[in-house]
């Protein structure tokens, strides 16, 4: 690349995590200096270390601070990544006003496409098909509800000012409209600072297919084929691929030409993505949804099938260079699939998780790419989007790519933070996914099936108990010093109470030593260590000789340390686990699955009731208390909303588990809470 690409030879990346590192990689390859910005929460983050230099800012949304950082470091250009300020027209103008090159489209194009109402009107005038709906600005709640009924249910409520699924609501019943509108406005305001909504007809069996476009400042524009993005949860993509298994070449070219027309309609320059909704039943019919005026999260799949570096193209176009190829030069080769690794728990409604990365092993190999912002020690909190990394593969055909991605995810181990990796593997193996029969509702319809493996296997409980035995073994020949339940004249057992994350305590009894034991995975326990059936004691205590847990069958097992992990033989089968410990919690990982297992600590007061299923309300995720809807002493009904918890701009309403009176309310709005923190205690009324 010539020196004119950036006169200062330095680019500031106004972002964090994996996308910042991704941009740094291309800058480094081109010999261009890189500048990172970071907040206090990210002071030790990997993207800070990977840049040539870094500077602190109070917020990634602080335009003045970002401009000031660029000036202070001598950067001549700013790459916004995606999210944060990437689609902020005021930021693009501020860069231009400061003499900085904004590596993105003109502010006028951002404004035209950033407002969904204006965008639909603009592209419709250019002949691009749009979904039937109402897109006037300033519609009141009543007008929105009336518009929804006019368009015809089901409808989608969508924020005008932003995308990514935030603030989007599917409404199928007129009675749900008031609550859906209020919730969508609240989330849109929190995410984009604008609660304007539009309403569109919901296309049945919809597929989400998008076209990558590129335009230069010389009037040239091309498309780089499509990406299939139909596999989503909560309107957010989790697996993307290129090309789409639905489209034939003729439809691909029609959609591509339509996307180029949309870009030209707003004088677009740079990388952009035109998103379409396509009926799986009628693939030749497609409708414009929106245009993202930035690099997309899923851009790597396009890179792998075209052989192009899209960040390099962004840099060249921003420097005023013409596109180095024409539409006829664009050829798609093979197939690429990407899976997004999120800090979330699919079995609990995809609620965000968090924590510190204790151990990390990311996949590698031929045609396997990982875009990641993680490192061992990284703190994953609730301040930012829960996406941690992307695993991207290429194959000669779709079947090969799917197999390669499944194998890659099987070798992905992250301990310390719960992720969706095992869920992604289950999704890739779904018969409809393998056959290419995709639509945006597939994940929701198949959720029970896809999370069926979420239950902790008995052998994992066994490994956790034996790991504690192994840690306590001293090598002392005195039988009294060995934690194997030994007593003169009779065999005994050592019971451990192990609690999986988000689950109930389970008793695991061990007779023998870690290398040669008989293990029984038994009944669920109450929080104070009592078993309703036999009243046995708490973790680590000695129980009566010969007593077995009613729910379990004794199994021969042995455990030994093996490098950074453990090797367990259980019932004649041997498996290796990656292991890491944090306090009383042991993390185990294998085949993309991870388990957090906490050795029981006797609970106090009302906390014990939570496990017993009484009136204790616990936080389903780490986050911030957004609203408390009751006060101590209030009478509440079962299922009544009591507390709203927010994490990563997602709200979750926690309801009363029983009817009764609010006895304790230890939290208030604005409080930070951990996973399973007590939010309220409800006492059932007597009689």
Where are these regions (language model features)?
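Catalytic cores of soluble metabolic enzymes centered on carboxylation/carboxyl-transfer
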Residues: 259, 300-303, 308-550, 641, ...
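N-terminal beta-alpha lobe that positions the nucleotide/phosphoryl donor
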Residues: 1-274, 278-299
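Short acidic-glycine loop/turn motifs at beta-strand connectors
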Residues: 173, 215-220, 278-283, 364, ...
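Catalytic P-loop NTP-binding/switch module of NTPases
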Residues: 574, 578-619
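Residues located in well-ordered beta-strands
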Residues: 198, 578, 596-598, 624, ...
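Structured functional modules or segments
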Residues: 606-687
